[in-house]
Each structure stands twice: as C-alpha cells, then as structure tokens.
Amino acid sequence: DFHFQTGGYLTEGSARLYDVQVETLFMGAAGPMRRSALAPIAHFMAGRDQRQVTLVDVACGTGRFLRQVRLAYPAMRLKGVDLSRPYLDETRRQLHGLRGAELIEAPAERMPLDSASADIVTSIFLFHELPPEVRRAVTAEIARVLKPGGLLVFLDSLQMGDRPGWDGLIEAFPERFHEPYYRHYAIDDLEGIFTAAGLEPEMTTTPFLSKLMVRRKA
C-alpha cells in the first residue's frame, strides 16, 4: 500500500492515477523536474550517434520520462524496466505514435540485461520507494549494466540538508503521503552508495524539490 493505493504499484488503477497524483502533489512541476534529467544526457550525447547509444530507464513507471527521451532522440535505443505490468502498459500508451522502446517486466535489482550493455542508465524517482538494502542492490545492478564510461542520471527527492528551508516538509512527507521508506532515504548516503559501486561523481544539483546526481562508471 503505497501513496494510500491498495496494491501499491501493481494495479491498473494505480497506473491510471499515478501521473495525476504526482502532478497534483508537485503543483505541475513533476514534468519540469523530470526534464532536468535531459540536460546531462544532452551533454553526454554531444558528438555521439544516437543510433549507437542504448539508454535503460530503471523503474520506468508510466513512461513519462521515456517519452521525453524519445521526443529528444528519435533514433536512440531505449529500454524500460519496471516491476509492474500495468505501468508498462501505460508506458506503451505514452509511446504510441512514436518509435517504441523495449519494455521489460523485472525488478530493478535483477534486470535481465547483459553486463556492460548500456551507455546511459536513468533512475527517476525510484530510490525513495526502496528499502535501504534494495537501494544498494539496485545501484550495484546499474553499475553492472553500464558500460565503462557510461552515465548514470539519477533524479529523486531532495534529502535532508540539501535545501535546509525545505527540511520540515521532507520530515513530514512520509507520514502525510504514506511513504514507508522515504524517511531513511532522506538521510541515506547516496554519495557513498554510488562511489562504492564504482560510479564516480560528475555533478549534483537540486531542481525545485528534486535532487539530480550524475555519475560515470569508471
């Protein structure tokens, strides 16, 4: 039961409601926060042939970010991984009329993808939904899937101390919106998790209520 939805992310009802809920919660800013993750991708893509680049969106959800990537890069090889079949069905609807993506129903910590097969891996608002040990397992799996020199583009909620004026909101958020793992996420050592997996820091910034971290596999 996440976000007061019985069945969590595994139901058709949740897939239909998710985007409306998120845009309402963030006062219409969820889309712009997601789009901030396109900037490091654009920097990485400078001088590269998009037809030769593979991007994997981990926990792609309803496909809003995959759609944004597809609009920006019509020929890029896209893969979306998600645990929820209803959410993957919603992703297919998001990509209707565009070149599609390979959609894979699987947990993020056990992706059926070859090692060193992705140039870019994106994680958009996933980690705050995960138990601490699963965050670490997913990070290790992302590092496995990335090619050497490949890019992780990570976008999630602010953490405590990122913007001290918002710390009260971050503290209240898990109770108000039934986020069972958010409280630990808000104080977790993301820098340490990524570094331990061999993902070296490139950039960290905080667009509105989100935290954007860019890491490169050594």
Name what the model sees in each region:
Residues 1-44:
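Conserved Class I S-adenosyl-L-methionine-dependent methyltransferase catalytic core
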Residues 51-61:
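Conserved class I S-adenosyl-L-methionine
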Residues 56, 64-110:
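Class I SAM-dependent methyltransferase SAM/SAH-binding core
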Residues 109-121:
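A short acidic, Gly/Pro-enriched loop at the edge of an enzyme's catalytic core
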Residues 119-133:
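A short SAM/SAH-binding and catalytic strip from SAM-dependent methyltransferases
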Residues 136, 153-197, 203-205:
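C-terminal alpha-helical "lid/dimerization" subdomain adjacent to the S-adenosyl-L-methionine
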Residues 136-148:
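A short glycine-rich, Lys/Arg-flanked "PGG" loop and its adjoining helix->strand segment in the class I
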Residues 197-218:
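Core SAM-dependent methyltransferase catalytic element
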